[in-house]
Amino acid sequence: MSRSGVAVSDEALKAFNDLKLGKKFKSIIYKLNDAKTEIVVDSTSTEDAYDAFVEDLPENDCRYAVYDFEYEVGQGDGKRNKIVFYQWSPDTASVRAKMVYASSKDALRRALNGIGTEIQGTDFSEVAYESVLEKISRTTGLH
């Protein structure tokens, strides 16, 4: 449980393991249930296009997300994958939603073992492919 008392649903954990171990999904978007007591799966996708994932993030509401980010390593070293955790809190979301999502994040983040990078986004430019790639490159030492 988090500081806000929010729990992570079994469905949320299963979906993550399906993404991480089974490669069943490319992305998962999580939300708080209506009672704000549990983090649940909002949607999953097998779509490879990163732009499609970003388009699934709501313009005016908060979400958590996980994306299996694939990128090219320089000097012809091939492709790599990192599981990226997103805390999506757009500037246009209500202050209450931002506060509840911020105080509940740790419960989900701690439950998801195997996250390579964490991204906090308040607008779409912060979750753009190039921005995320730059952060991954900094954290892995690839340039």
Swiss-Prot record:
It holds the Pfam family Cofilin_ADF. GO terms for biological process: actin filament depolymerization; cell division. InterPro entries: ADF-H, ADF-H/Gelsolin-like_dom_sf, ADF/Cofilin. The keyword Cell cycle applies. GO terms for molecular function: actin binding. PANTHER family: COFILIN-RELATED (PTHR11913). Controls reversibly actin polymerization and depolymerization in a pH-sensitive manner. It has the ability to bind G- and F-actin in a 1:1 ratio of cofilin to actin. Binding to F-actin is regulated by tropomyosin. It is the major component of intranuclear and cytoplasmic actin rods. Required for accumulation of actin at the cell division site via depolymerizing actin at the cell ends. In association with myosin II has a role in the assembly of the contractile ring via severing actin filaments. Involved in the maintenance of the contractile ring once formed. This is Cofilin. It comes from Ogataea parapolymorpha (strain ATCC 26012 / BCRC 20466 / JCM 22074 / NRRL Y-7560 / DL-1) (Yeast).
